[in-house]
Amino acid sequence: MAQIQFSRGVAEPVIPDVRLTRSRSGQSGTATFYFREPSIFNSESTDEVTGMYLVDEEGEITTTEVKGKFINGKATDIEAILIMRSPEEWDRFMRFMERYAKEQGLEFSQAGQS
């Protein structure tokens, strides 16, 4: 099962908006995730954000570049950035996203496609 987690072992049910960029050479890329009101910020949650973990049957992709957005002193949103430094890392990320999208009933579309 493909999951996104902010605290190890705790799946985040909120589906993010994901923006991808890739270098012209294809050697590197960036995925920026935006989570609006993620469940980890619920008042019942005592879990701490320790990073963003993309977990599936192949293993785990991790980033610690995770920022919270605060309004009136209350955490509301999360932005996480995953940098891929090789074509292999990009391919691995895309395999995760295909699994995640399929399980969540989402579709992937590239910019410029109709």
Curated annotation (Swiss-Prot):
Family under the similarity heading: Belongs to the Psb28 family.
GO cellular component, one term: plasma membrane-derived thylakoid membrane
Membrane among keywords: yes
HAMAP family (alphabetical): PSII_Psb28
Entries under PANTHER family matching the protein: PHOTOSYSTEM II REACTION CENTER PSB28 PROTEIN, CHLOROPLASTIC (PTHR34963:SF2), PTHR34963
A Gene Ontology biological process term: photosynthesis
Membrane topology value: Peripheral membrane protein
Entry keyword set: Membrane, Photosynthesis, Photosystem II, Thylakoid
InterPro entries, A to Z: Psb28_c1_sf, PSII_Psb28_class-1
Record's subcellular location: Cellular thylakoid membrane
Protein name: Photosystem II reaction center Psb28 protein
Subunit: Part of the photosystem II complex.
